[in-house]
Amino acid sequence: MEDDDSYVPSDLTAEERQELENIRRRKQELLADIQRLKEEIAEVANEIESLGSTEERKNMQRNKQVAMGRKKFNMDPKKGIQFLIENGLLKNTCEDIAQFLYKGEGLNKTAIGDYLGERDEFSIQVLHAFVELHEFTDLNLVQALRQFLWSFRLPGEAQKIDRMMEAFAQRYCQCNTGVFQSTDTCYVLSFAIIMLNTSLHNPNVKDKPTVERFIAMNRGINDGGDLPEELLRNLYESIKNEPFKIPEDDGNDLTHTFFNPDREGWLLKLGGGRVKTWKRRWFILTDNCLYYFEYTTDKEPRGIIPLENLSIREVEDSKKPNCFELYIPDNKDQVIKACKTEADGRVVEGNHTVYRISAPTPEEKEDWIKCIKAAISRDPFYEMLAARKKKVSSTKRH
């Protein structure tokens, strides 16, 4: 017996034959519906997947910009904050900036201290918002100072220190009402404790102050009255037993960024302006970025070229030997995303569609190409986008 939908038993009545035909037609309709549903489900699944990858891509891009903003902050705090605000990564409010500094993730603590110590009105507001984020309730003064002085590195200038310690004293008294008669008392005692820390733990200070001397030094500072002796003894013992930890910069500053590069050396770079001139620059390859400096001693690079989605090729040049180029594959007219510092200190986007570079020797050229190839990272979305652009442009031509 044939086992397919065309087979009709010979002993069926006309009515039964009609019913069988209806059943088979309905079956075909249902199978078509099932297939249509499968296709719709697959389409929705693809949309959900592409939405997820779009979100993921946005997050990746955001994280990269935040990392670049942190590096800029560690080079120049004000420029770093400006970069983060301009790229929508930070709100231009003292509260948002204070929160960013308080979290301190990847930030150089000396740079935090420098920014907080600035004397312009906005920086002072950021300082107060930063201090407000510290919770000093029920901490004795030494404990509060330990917490505060660990969150940044005190700058060297007396006026900056004065502003910061004044803000600290106000916040401590706000969190612990009744401990001191005034913020002035708290301010004076805080300085006395910092000086005590230096005297007790600096090996160059031979004459170590006793607890009695510390108590005597702080007589009459509580609005003319004396502070409880027990309080002063406790503060003295706390500092004697455990010195303040001064934050070492946490390895995310520029010194660390450029400390162990993949490669560094002098190269010639062809300028991107209307007049093409070759300039000698000190190049450092690290963290999937190529940095270039005017001098090896410069703190701040003249330019930063992220290597993501770039390719590298050897090229011949009539003026210079041992040349290679960084370029965007399949997109000869697109400007490479990079930034450079102008002579007046402004950070601007680069205007190169290719970066042409000349090495001193053929061997160095080969080494640079090999190292840059290893550092280049590719974003599959970018390749997909480039392919789509190519397809669109070829469609337009036909």
Curated annotation (Swiss-Prot):
Keywords: Acetylation, Cell junction, Cell membrane, Coiled coil, Cytoplasm, Guanine-nucleotide releasing factor, Lipid-binding, Membrane, Tight junction, Ubl conjugation. A 1,2-diacyl-sn-glycero-3-phospho-(1D-myo-inositol-3,4,5-trisphosphate) binds at K269, L270, G271, G272, G273, R274, V275, K276, T277, R281, Y292, R302, N351. Residues 260-377 form the PH domain. It comes from the Eukaryota. Residues 73-202 form the SEC7 domain. The modification N-acetylmethionine is found at M1. Pfam families: PH, Sec7. CDD domains: PH_GRP1-like (cd01252), Sec7 (cd00171). The keyword Coiled coil applies. Binds via its PH domain to the inositol head group of phosphatidylinositol 3,4,5-trisphosphate. Promotes guanine-nucleotide exchange on ARF1, ARF5 and ARF6. Promotes the activation of ARF factors through replacement of GDP with GTP. Plays an important role in membrane trafficking, during junctional remodeling and epithelial polarization, through regulation of ARF6 activity. Interacts with TRIM23 and CYTIP. Interacts (via coiled-coil domain) with FRMD4A (via coiled-coil domain). Interacts with FRMD4B. Found in a complex with PARD3, CYTH1 and FRMD4A. Interacts (via N-terminal domain) with INAVA (via N-terminal domain). This is Cytohesin-1. The lineage of its organism: Eukaryota, Metazoa, Chordata, Craniata, Vertebrata.
